[in-house]
């Protein structure tokens, strides 16, 4: 017979991993990583909070213990794109400027980049020449940035 810890241990570890990789995600985003298991995920978030392993900031974002509650808004926006592919995603991870995150879905590598106001030329230069053959998804705040 399995204990409760054995049953939920992997799910709790996966949830803690998501909070650590993408600090500042809100509950809705975290629940999307666990489709069909929202009640379990909510209970695990509460459990991780009580253990002192994560905390929820005043704006609703979840952070690992010891982190400053300052979220990377560009990364949070990029995670929404990832969540559109989450059922097909085999792997995902944060990335370095100008790409905010990368993921594999359906045998393709995707890079999600965020272009902030005033960084258009810099990001364009940094993304020039796609040698890796990845598919790029570019996030902009407004159509005037295109």
Language model regions located:
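Short acidic, hydrophobic short linear motifs in intrinsically disordered regions
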Residues: 24-33
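Short alpha-helical segments that sit at the start of domains
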Residues: 1-14
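Conserved small/polar residues in nucleotide/adenosyl-binding loops
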Residues: 144-146
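Short amphipathic alpha-helical interaction segments
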Residues: 36-47
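Short helix-capping/hinge SLiMs at alpha-helix to coil transitions
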Residues: 18-22
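Glycine-centered, phosphate/nucleic-acid-interacting loop/turn motifs that mediate DNA/RNA or nucleotide
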Residues: 52
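DNA-contacting interfaces and partner/effector-binding or oligomerization modules
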Residues: 118-119, 135-142
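Nucleic-acid-binding surface
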Residues: 55-128
